[in-house]
Amino acid sequence: MTSSGVYTIAEVEAMTGLSAEVLRQWERRYGFPKPRRTPGGHRLYSAEDVEALKTIKRWLEEGATPKAAIRRYLAQEVRPEDLGTGLLEALLRGDLAGAEALFRRGLRFWGPEGVLEHLLLPVLREVGEAWHRGEIGVAEEHLASTFLRARLQELLDLAGFPPGPPVLVTTPPGERHEIGAMLAAYHLRRKGVPALYLGPDTPLPDLRALARRLGAGTVVLSAVLSEPLRALPDGALKDLAPRVFLGGQGAGPEEARRLGAEYMEDLKGLAEALWLPRGPEKEAI
């Protein structure tokens, strides 16, 4: 592989099992692949080219002709800026295989953080808005959200788990919306914080006991709805751990203060806030 992250034709030949002669023949005959050229005229293939060629070779092994396999690949190719629309449409028609292929394409193109920002979160928002507008039913919303939540869990797993006493991340009792908590755990892990995501709707006594057993110095709670928070008594979060952060659209500074937590305005700066001592002057993070 060259220093710029692309491959020579010899490397592609070894990686795909397709000969250099075949690659040049396809380029002349079908206009695919379309490698870049060095000033000296040598072909350079991207990682996406390599993945495409592996897919096409698999179809050839299944009995397709080169022409049919290349046409099939080009027909399904989507520009990065159109991936969101394609993913949403695939989910709403129940095409999970197609949705998975689009997610993988986005992951290859943007990487984990980029696919989260440019694909998963926009599609999640659009699914929620479509449900609120009455354009899709509960079943479609559940299907799409389940797929997207699973991909977010995959990104969370890819982020690894840094060493050290864990930071426990969950939602308050009665709060089933977990995307905000998953995002908090993901961003903390990317910042080197050992965030342990527990899932949603964790009973406070169990959360308190786990924090003590694992030696967790911090608990982070994300709330989308305000009702579960209002149902909690004053100081309910105070002794979950030495530090407790509460955030999300259902929370606010005054409610956090009432419950005995530090208010987390957004995810930006949360990791840094974990290293700062708690003080009365820090009512919002």
Swiss-Prot record:
Q: Name one GO molecular function term.
A: metal ion binding
Q: Which GO terms describe its biological process?
A: carotenoid biosynthetic process
Which InterPro entries does the record match to this protein? Cbl-bd_cap, Cobalamin-bd_sf, DNA-bd_dom_put_sf, MerR-type_HTH_dom, MerR_fam, Meth_synthase_dom
Record's keyword annotation contains DNA-binding:
yes
Keywords, alphabetical: Carotenoid biosynthesis, DNA-binding, Plasmid, Repressor, Transcription, Transcription regulation
Which PROSITE patterns does the protein's record reference?
Answer: HTH_MERR_2
Pfam families attached to this UniProt entry: B12-binding_2, MerR_1
Activity-regulation annotation: Requires cobalamin (vitamin B12) for repressor activity. In the dark, binding of cobalamin to CarH induces its oligomerization, which enhances binding to the DNA and repressor activity. Light causes cobalamin photolysis and disruption of the cobalamin-CarH complex, which decreases interaction with DNA and allows transcription of the target genes.
Supply the SMART domains for this chain: HTH_MERR
Gene3D superfamilies (UniProt xref): 1.10.1660.10, Cobalamin-binding domain, Methionine synthase domain
Highest taxon of source = Bacteria
Q: Which CDD domains match?
A: HTH_MlrA-CarA (cd01104)
Q: Where is the B12-binding domain?
A: 164-285
Query: Whereabouts does the entry annotate DNA binding, in residue ranges?
Result: 9-28
Domain HTH merR-type, by residue range, is 6-76
Q: How does it assemble?
A: Homotetramer in the dark in the presence of cobalamin. Monomer in the light or in the absence of cobalamin.
Function, in words: Negative regulator of genes involved in carotenoid biosynthesis.
What family, per the record? Answer: Belongs to the CarA/CarH B12-binding photoregulator family.
Q: What is recorded about the domains?
A: The N-terminal region interacts with DNA, and the C-terminal region is involved in oligomerization and binding of cobalamin.
What this protein is called in its record is HTH-type transcriptional repressor CarH
Originating species: Thermus thermophilus (strain ATCC 27634 / DSM 579 / HB8)
